[in-house]
Amino acid sequence: PFFFNDTATTEIYTLSLHDALPIFLASAANWVVLVCGSEGYGNYRHHADIAHAYQIVKAGGVDPDHIITMMYNDVPFATSNPFPGKLYNHPGDDVPDVYEGVVVDYEKKEVSPENLIKVLTGDESTGKKVLKSTKEDNVFLFFSDHGGPDILALPGGYLHSKDLLDAINTMHEKEMYNKFVLYIEACFSGSMFLKLPDNLNVVAVTAANDQESSWGWYCGSEAVVKGKSLGTCLGDEFSVYWMEDADKGEQKTETLDEQFKRLVKGVTKSHVMRYGDVSFKEDVIGEFIGYPKSRNAVPYQHSFEQWDSRDNEMLFRLYMAQHTTGKEQKKWQQLYEEEVASRKAIDRYFNALAKEAKYYQMPEPVENTECYARAIKQFEDIMGRSDYSLKYFNVFANMCNENPLAFSGY
């Protein structure tokens, strides 16, 4: 503990802000929540994104007890993975295994909206690690997965923007943070924060605006590590860009605003957005992810093969069908044809449900979460869950905004 008498306090205030800051932050701590919300080898990139982020914050000196990781955790050991127990977020021969040493706190169906809310609000009924941060501490959350209008996908269900914003308000009321930064990699991720207040010391940076997909990076023929093809995407454009920037080790000097501007300029396939409170945009990013030294920094390279996240599963299966032989080729060809057939069935469902063009426009913020959730459940009970179908959920949002009683007869 630090004890200051009046004289010492006076002397501290005579220091420059840069010199004094470490003294005042000495009792503060960093907390990090990392969430991979997908499963299946076709979603390799999300697992690799989160594992890479774990390495960055751990190397930055964040207490491992303050890092909470949620990951389905099937991809590292999938039969399709040519490197069992390893994950790579960048192609090449001399690239690090980002899965090494990663501690997963919530896995399989434990990765649910309910548990994520409990983690954020410090609800220990999970019996597992949750945030125990205080009003002196900074919190950083990184999420990588699929999304749709007003929702983020998790293996255990969908996180609606209202529920996330309610959790943030609870954190604010319980004084669980000094400043809170969220980085969100998902399609339509901007839609989660259209109602985020600008006075809570919370800022969210999203891979896409509220109307577009985010994109897989280092995909297909480019996803080659140590001479072996992984067949899918190694990362996502937004995630790869901010983490390979962080790997340079400039966290003591680079500000949140500087990194945001680099992301806006560097991410080419979607529009990086920022929501909430920007009053602390000049804070250095190390205040949230720690101060790692450059750790095998791999120079960022523009990917020449990118996949729309909506098409990733189909393109992955097609790639495998084209690059295998014999029984394996037949298996992947059948899986590819099944995916194409599923997508056509989903197209037909929505064409029959909503014939008017107005329903296909991007909605205003979802006003009736209960109706929206009912619509999604009704669809998935009939058609099953699909990453591809998320592109159509704006139809549900628009119909529910127009008539809150829609889908209530189900």
Language-model features and meaning:
Residues 24-410:
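Cysteine endopeptidase catalytic domains of the caspase/legumain-like
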Residues 7-21:
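Short, small-residue-biased leader/transition segments that mark boundaries at the very start
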